[in-house]
């Protein structure tokens, strides 16, 4: 008899606990689905307009606590997904920005190294040109010195010849004076 009372108590208690939980749960989900899925108007066939479903915020009823909880959990899950997607999007944007910045940095480094190489090449060419200029300058100075030396030698020869001619003229003049002979004119005009 005690077992029958326990089973009857269990039978009485279990439907009372389970019955309210089963009935409110399907109703709010169906209502929420009906609110979210609005059929597009017939006129929208002509226009390609994308409409976001408008969620109507109705005051929540105090009597259906389980339904409110389901709606809140659904909203919370939706917000969680949205925030995750937004965080992912921001992360991807940040990664893309970092990759682009790194590539730009690499391009700057490449440009700077190439510029430095070209400038080094230019300096090397300038040094070679300076050396050649110095060498040619030295050669030209040597040529000028050689020309000056030759000119001095030629001047010396001219001076020597002049001295010889003067000496010869003096000797001839002395000879003509001593002999009393008048020299012949060297010019054939007279």
Swiss-Prot record:
Nucleotide-binding as UniProt keyword: no
List compositional bias (Basic and acidic residues) regions by residue number. Answer: 1-12
Looking up Pfam families in the UniProt record yields: Remorin_C (PF03763), Remorin_N (PF03766)
Concerning what turns on (or off) its expression, the entry says: 10-fold by auxin, 2-fold by gibberellic acid and not by cytokinin.
* Positions of modified residues (Phosphoserine): 14
Kindly state which keywords UniProt assigns to this record, in alphabetical order.
Coiled coil, Phosphoprotein
Tell me the segments the record calls region Disordered: 1-45, 50-69
The record's tissue-specificity note reads: Expressed in roots, leaves, stems, flowers and siliques, with a maximal expression in apical regions.
Q: According to the UniProt record, list the residues that bear Phosphothreonine.
A: 58
> What is the purpose of this protein?
Exhibits a non sequence-specific DNA-binding activity.
Task: Please give the family membership noted in the entry.
Answer: Belongs to the remorin family.
- Identification of the protein by name: Remorin
Species this chain originates from: Arabidopsis thaliana
Query: What are the top taxonomic ranks of the organism?
Result: Eukaryota, Viridiplantae, Streptophyta, Embryophyta, Tracheophyta
């Amino acid at each position: 008899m005690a077992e029958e009372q326990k089973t009857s108590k269990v039978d009485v208690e279990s439907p009372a606990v389970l019955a309210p939980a089963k009935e409110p749960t399907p109703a709010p989900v169906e209502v929420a689905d009906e609110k979210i899925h609005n059929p597009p108007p017939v006129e929208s066939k002509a226009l390609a307009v994308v409409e976001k479903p408008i969620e109507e915020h109705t005051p929540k009823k105090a009597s259906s606590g389980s339904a409110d909880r389901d709606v809140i959990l659904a909203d919370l899950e939706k917000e969680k997904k949205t925030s995750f997607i937004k965080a992912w999007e921001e992360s991807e944007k940040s990664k893309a920005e970092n990759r682009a910045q790194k590539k730009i940095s690499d391009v700057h480094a490449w440009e700077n190294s190439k510029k430095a190489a070209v400038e080094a090449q230019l300096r090397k060419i300038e040094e070679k040109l300076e050396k050649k200029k110095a060498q040619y300058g030295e050669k030209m100075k040597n040529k000028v010195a050689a020309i000056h030396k030759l000119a001095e030698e030629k001047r010396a020869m001219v001076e020597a010849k002049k001295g010889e001619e003067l000496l010869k003229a003096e000797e001839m003049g002395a000879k003509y004076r001593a002999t009393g002979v008048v020299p012949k004119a060297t010019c054939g005009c007279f």
